[in-house]
């Protein structure tokens, strides 16, 4: 067996790991998601999936050709192609991603397709982390930077003046940030984390030299979670009544729209459709797996 000596410096300062995917998102919204992350400083994305529709494969292929996306196929660990079966593969996919990239990523960014960690004061992740560490008064970075979850429910009224596929610009009303460690998303040092799951580093190495986690102040950044409200009519009404408008994302608008427009133009030249493509939808994707008998 060949011995591979890892690079002394990680190739990527920020790399995204997406677990076994479920839920739906159209191809244009996926482009906005990946381009927003790239604008903030992410230089590689690792996605785990069981099967992809032709439209999604084409969109993914565009980003694979650019060298910014790696797709790993991971069928469910049991012959159950429902949402429940899909979730069983999530821990394995994230820990596989962490191990694969332990010496490639300085920071592993754990998010899903309907989430993005957005700075409220800074233009990119590098400047944001520099500010966080300065506030902490230490030079040594921590193992995990944890960002509180904020729901940007798609039930809230959208800003119709924004383009239909620019989800982060259209939906700017959010509920109260969740408590610390309740459904957060994180930046993780993969060389100091022994086990990871979809919110933060679960177990650090016993001799880890760094502080375990930082609860990032919500005035600095939050994890924006775009989804339908599923908490029941009464609670959803309460969320809606107390929702606040956050326009801090609009400072990214010009650059983000340019990036998305350029990417969509490239996809059109490649004859890639911009119609709705089911990325990670359990009923669609795992149905495809059954049909193809992977």
Q: What are these model-predicted stretches?
A:
Residues 4-17, 21-22, 53-110, 118-119:
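Active-site-proximal specificity loops/subdomain of glycosyltransferases
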Residues 1, 87, 91, 119-294:
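Catalytic-site signature of metal-activated, phosphate-bearing donor transferases
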Residues 26-35:
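Short, acidic/polar
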Residues 9-11, 25, 40, 66, ...:
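Eukaryote-biased feature marking scaffold/signaling PDZ-domain proteins and nuclear chromatin regulators
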Residues 49-50:
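Acidic ATP/Mg2+-coordinating residue in the GHKL
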Residues 35-44:
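Short, acidic, metal-binding catalytic loop of nucleotide-sugar glycosyltransferases
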């Amino acid at each position: 067996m060949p011995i591979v000596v890892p690079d002394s410096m990680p190739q990527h300062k920020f790399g995204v790991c997406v677990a076994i995917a479920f839920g739906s998102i159209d191809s244009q919204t996926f482009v906005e998601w990946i381009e927003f992350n790239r604008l903030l400083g992410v230089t590689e994305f690792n996605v785990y999936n069981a099967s992809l529709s032709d439209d999604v494969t084409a969109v993914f292929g565009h980003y694979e050709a650019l060298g910014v996306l790696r797709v790993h196929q991971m069928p469910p660990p049991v012959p159950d192609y429902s949402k429940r079966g899909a979730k069983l593969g999530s821990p394995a996919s994230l820990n596989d991603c962490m191990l694969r990239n332990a010496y490639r990523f300085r920071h592993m960014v754990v998010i899903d397709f309907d989430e993005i960690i957005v700075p409220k004061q800074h233009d990119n992740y590098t400047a944001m982390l520099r500010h966080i560490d300065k506030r902490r008064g230490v030079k040594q970075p921590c193992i995990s930077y944890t960002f509180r979850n904020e729901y940007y429910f798609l039930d809230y009224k959208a800003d119709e003046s924004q383009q239909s596929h620019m989800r982060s610009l259209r939906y700017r009303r959010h509920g109260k940030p969740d408590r610390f460690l309740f459904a957060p998303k994180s930046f993780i040092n993969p060389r100091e984390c022994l086990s990871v799951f979809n919110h933060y580093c679960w177990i650090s190495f016993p001799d880890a030299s760094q502080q375990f986690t930082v609860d990032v102040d919500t005035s600095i950044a939050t994890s924006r979670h775009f989804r339908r409200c599923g908490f029941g009519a009464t609670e959803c009404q309460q969320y809606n009544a107390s929702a606040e408008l956050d326009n801090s994302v609009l400072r990214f608008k010009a650059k983000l729209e340019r990036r998305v427009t350029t990417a969509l133009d490239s996809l059109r030249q490649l004859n890639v459709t911009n119609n709705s493509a089911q990325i990670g939808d359990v009923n669609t994707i795992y149905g495809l797996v059954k049909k193809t008998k992977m």
